[in-house]
Structure formats: C-alpha cells, structure tokens
Amino acid sequence: MPSRSKSSQRWLKEHFADPYVKKARAEGMRSRAAYKLEELLQRDRLLKPGMVVVDLGAAPGGWSQQVRKSMGDSGRVVALDILDMPALAGVEFLHGDFREQAVLSQFEAMLGDVPVDLVLSDMAPNKSGMDAVDQPRMMHLAELAMEFADAHLKPGGAFLIKLFQGVGSDDYIRELRRRYEKVTIRKPAASRKRSPEVYALGQGKRVQIK
C-alpha cells in the first residue's frame, strides 16, 4: 500500500486535532459543518418554530441535523441530495438530483401548498486543488441553488449559501442583492482560516428581481 503524501498526513493530523471534529464526535453530530450553521442560525436568528427549511446537497446530514436540533419537534426539514444519506429523525430526505424535473415534482408533491421559509446550501464540488477548475464548479453549484430558491422560496424568505471567494463570487453576491432586501457575508468560527469559503445570507426575498 503506498504511503500517504506529506500533505495528506498533515490534513489528517489537523482533522483529528480539530476541536469541532472532536465536538461533533462527542455530541453525535454528523459533521463539523453543523457548528458553522449553528453560529449562523443564532447570530441572524434565522429559525422560528414551525418553519419549513430545505437543505440542498444535504449529505452527510450535519446541517439538517442542526436545524432539527434547533427547531425541536416543530416545522419541517426537507433534505435533498444526489448522494444517499442515512435517515435522520425528523428530517424528510429526497434522494436525487434537484435539477431533474422528476425530483422537483416529488419535492413539490411532498410539500403541497406549504411555503418554504428558508433554503440552505452547503454544497461544494470535489476539490481538485486547482482554482481554475474548482471555482467554476463551485459557482455552478451556487447558481443552481439560487435558481432553486428563486423558484421555491416564499417572498420574504431567507437563503443561506456557501461560496468560495474568487472569480464570479462578487457578481453572484450582486445577483443576490437584486433578489433579497438584505445580504450579509459571514465567516463562522468553525470555518478554517485558510479556507476561501464564506457564507452569503439573503434575507427578505423580493417579490420581483430588481
């Protein structure tokens, strides 16, 4: 078996020493990403009892798990992913690609006439390590998530999405400002400092794009 590269060994060492990884294990959370969302939800008071929350690209389920934990037994949490995800109590999971009409039809049938209050996306591509490849892939996923929110989020609702700072991210944020009354950029404490990731939060979805 070939030995791990120095960069791989360094990543593993950092990963297992990470306080958020340790906390996730101790508290039974599926990923350290849950603590990024926990901070964002609390800071901006995004959740209220009875809300309908949609989590795009939800696997392995850390964000959906955090939303359900924060809301208790009220409201609905709907998770979508092209990857399979083990069941989570209180989370409705739709396995499929939300770009496909058949999957969207299933989603719409699940919700009926119930409006969506909050759309979340922590989606990211498998990283190649090359910005010229990774950044366009990331922006493509972000565009898909924004289109989903355009179509399914209720007026006045909120949209929270992960972005990589780089080519296209400023233009994307400008597009968010056309769609939402208030747009804020956040970098939660659980985000690694060297990571280009930030979270864009749009609140107060406009009835019409400006």
Curated annotation (Swiss-Prot):
Localization, UniProt: Cytoplasm
Main location: cytoplasm
Documented EC number(s): 2.1.1.166
GO cellular component annotations of the record: cytoplasm
Swiss-Prot/TrEMBL keywords: Cytoplasm, Methyltransferase, rRNA processing, S-adenosyl-L-methionine, Transferase
Keyword rRNA processing found: yes
Domain of life: Bacteria
Catalysed reactions, semicolon-separated: uridine(2552) in 23S rRNA + S-adenosyl-L-methionine = 2'-O-methyluridine(2552) in 23S rRNA + S-adenosyl-L-homocysteine + H(+)
Active site positions, chain numbering: 162
Gene3D superfamilies assigned to the protein according to its UniProt record, in alphabetical order: Vaccinia Virus protein VP39
UniProt-annotated binding residues for S-adenosyl-L-methionine: 61, 63, 81, 97, 122
InterPro entries noted in UniProt: RNA_methyltr_RlmE (IPR050082), RNA_MeTrfase_FtsJ_dom (IPR002877), rRNA-MeTfrase_E (IPR015507), SAM-dependent_MTases_sf (IPR029063)
Alphabetical list of SUPFAM superfamilies matching this protein: S-adenosyl-L-methionine-dependent methyltransferases
Residue ranges crossing the lipid bilayer per the database entry: none
GO molecular-function term, one example from the UniProt record: rRNA (uridine-2'-O-)-methyltransferase activity
Range of residues in the leader sequence: none
Entry-linked Pfam families: FtsJ
Function: Specifically methylates the uridine in position 2552 of 23S rRNA at the 2'-O position of the ribose in the fully assembled 50S ribosomal subunit.
Family statement: Belongs to the class I-like SAM-binding methyltransferase superfamily. RNA methyltransferase RlmE family.
Alphabetized PANTHER family for the sequence: RIBOSOMAL RNA METHYLTRANSFERASE (PTHR10920), RRNA METHYLTRANSFERASE 2, MITOCHONDRIAL (PTHR10920:SF18)
Record HAMAP family: RNA_methyltr_E
Protein name: Ribosomal RNA large subunit methyltransferase E
Organism (species): Xanthomonas oryzae pv. oryzae (strain KACC10331 / KXO85)
